[in-house]
């Protein structure tokens, strides 16, 4: 029976939990943050978001999403034009054309009762900092030119070479600089580029320094990682890793279709969010790695059902719930972001698992997990182009010994479906899903939350990552 394999997998994983995972208040919570990010405007216009749009979106989030738990604002890429620096070479603004810098905007966000996230890589050095030959804070006479590497990220951003004296002080100093500005979330991008050009040992050394300085106060989001050896390096130093390609234009392509079923050994290993969440699901659990399915642009989905599908995937996988829709693009998608019953799962640190990690199987579209009070949450997804019936067996799949649910609740329709025996079944149209909460009768086969299977038993399927 399927449950026997699942139960064995979970029990063994509890005994063999990966002790090398980064231990922080964030990984202990289990799920990613809920926040707004400036990605959509930047992607659509292929340039940095202007200050007036930034302000309007902050105000919109404060009025429409903050009360639902989306309590953080984060800038995004297109960062090359951030060339305004302080005496030690650290950037003081998201963009040099902006009137105001980090101090002003961090206070503006904080005054609205929200936290601040920053998109930046501490291994970067701006062109301005290089040619100013700034003194590296914490060193005796070492300057920026002396720690720059031989390979640049691009014409405006250089890489720091970790083998050079002063590199540690630069990288740790950048993290400390952002922490002192009140930043609680650091989104570190283009990691594959550094590892590719400087090698895995140098890459790991840089991440180690970042994690040491971040401590338990700053959330570390690792973006565009190669995740060689199934994230062995990233697991030790990050709170959250990206598991699939960028959102880009969004839509069903991003959610489920792009390069479906295909795998690469380097970034991006998977082309769509669903495949990535399946493939790395064995790493995720409280005290382990948080999976990042990237940003949601729900306004790009075809209809309400597709919006619910993508949001449900992020919730079931324990991902960050990162809103990229804006005040003038979100439209009817706002109601999806405001589903308090789904949000509560994220609040409780809920992380679900697919019943199989084998891409393309129906079991990989059936996700299950357990809440601290013993209730089960089940997500059934139809990724296909034809209608399908999906079901969950209370005993075989969940281990409910009585085979009885005293109540099943539909979390999207906010409706109690009542008592059910043996199983729950749903007829799902293409690109739709259902998420239910099951209150079992009597004892279940296990009471522990679903744990990571990294370094424990493995699923019957390997996708090669």
Report the location of each language-model feature:
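Bacterial Sec-dependent N-terminal signal peptides
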Residues: 1-22
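Mature N-terminal, pre-catalytic/accessory segment of carbohydrate-active enzymes
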Residues: 20-35, 39, 44, 441-448
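Active-site-proximal substrate-binding groove within the catalytic cores of carbohydrate-active enzymes
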Residues: 31-37, 207-411, 423-441
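Aromatic-lined carbohydrate-binding/catalytic grooves of carbohydrate-active enzymes
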Residues: 36, 40-43, 49-50, 54-172, ...
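Short secondary-structure boundary/capping segments
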Residues: 88-92, 133-135, 203-207, 234-241
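Extracytoplasmic, non-cytosolic globular domains
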Residues: 182-186, 190-218, 222-225
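Solvent-exposed beta-strand/loop surfaces of large extracellular or lumenal domains
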Residues: 404-422, 455-464
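Glycan-recognition and processing domains
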Residues: 441-465
